[in-house]
């Protein structure tokens, strides 16, 4: 009986140790992130690569800026006026997490005064031609500290606030492809600071949170509508010029073959 009584706690301790080991392994996997922003020729653009088990599972290149309204006292110290802080995403610490249907990127900077979390989901839709998978940016959360003096000057009720997206469906892309968009895009975030809306401005975006085949290599790009329209506007004059030139050549050729009498 004594041996059995001693064996049970040993088994329990072993289970606890295994659970702790599993938890630590998950934490280590989440923190396997590489910040390659130094490779970018654009000083405003950041590059993040999340790896799990030695394999790239999320890649993100983008420039981000946050427009944050906050209250300060007017010169009479009676009225409140609204100022605006422009906060750029800088090259700080980061945490990533990958999954089959959910992936996440978190970035912290200025001693964790600011934190950005981006959640991506992959979904299947029943279409007339059969099931179709897409992925999208489903949630953005931005945490900021208005007592941080670099961007905020004498903010009233200074402290940490959280701004969240609401029913977000952005960067929608067919599964297996990366999303690319050079144009600026804005996302509105409702702040815990009463009656304040934070604006997130994204640009020079190239993201793939799922189905990466080769390390550090994006899959085929799915371009945003704005970029496609701008590309068409750039190439259309060239196409029209070529057509006009061809018409002139054909007209001259016909004129020489059939000269007027």
From Swiss-Prot:
Domain of life (superkingdom): Eukaryota
Signal peptide: 1-29
Pfam families to which the protein is assigned, alphabetical: Lamp2-like_luminal
Record's bilayer topology term: Single-pass type I membrane protein
Keyword Cell cycle part of the UniProt annotation: no
GO BP terms, alphabetized: establishment of protein localization to organelle
Main location, first listed in the record: membrane
PTM remark: Glycosylated.
Cytoplasmic side: 256-261
Cellular-component GO terms for this entry: cytoplasmic vesicle membrane; dendrite membrane; early endosome membrane; endoplasmic reticulum-Golgi intermediate compartment membrane; endosome membrane; growth cone membrane; late endosome membrane; lysosomal membrane
Lineage, highest ranks first: Eukaryota, Metazoa, Chordata, Craniata, Vertebrata
The protein's name in its UniProt record: Lysosome-associated membrane glycoprotein 5
Residues bearing glycans: 35, 53, 126
Protein purpose: Plays a role in short-term synaptic plasticity in a subset of GABAergic neurons in the brain.
